[in-house]
Amino acid sequence: MIRCLVPLIAEKLHGTEPTLPVVLIDLIDDLPHREEPSLVEQWQFDFWSPEHDLGGWTHFTYDQSSRKGWYVTVLVGVDRQIVLVVDPKIQIPQLTQYLEFRAEGIWAQHVCETPLEHWTVGLEAFGVTLETPEDAMGNQWGKRTGVGLDLEWEQIDKPESTDSGFSQQCSVTGEVLIDDEVIDLNAQG
């Protein structure tokens, strides 16, 4: 599933609780809104594959006024330990159309191939494998783990409005790398 959180006029004026109805979804909503320097934008991508006991969630936030980003990818499963890649303070002087950034131990890009139809997400990073889920909320110490994503999200359904933007059902295909494990993914998101 793809989620794009687009602040409404009410959120800009009154905080995060919308007081106006959700606006219609436009193709431009899938892309950064460069003309609005005060926006904090978010993109989320998720998937679940019962076949591989693997779910994933990627979240990228960009604050145009501070030129900082926040990034997290989590890989989980019923019989898997949590793998976490997180950087809460990424300096991004100029956000590219590919939503790409590099920081210490991480490179990621989020390419909108066709608005509201097709996204490509790439990640090469070092994350950590956590011993317990609670470690994700604490010091996030764990075993250093190589993580890679080369995934495509393709539209199954039309996007649906939400209180904070929109979401959309997609098919998700590609590769997930966790250290030496290579997972050929064909999932829903």
Indicate where each model-derived feature is located:
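Targeting-peptide/extracellular-domain and disordered-appendage signature
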Residues: 1-189
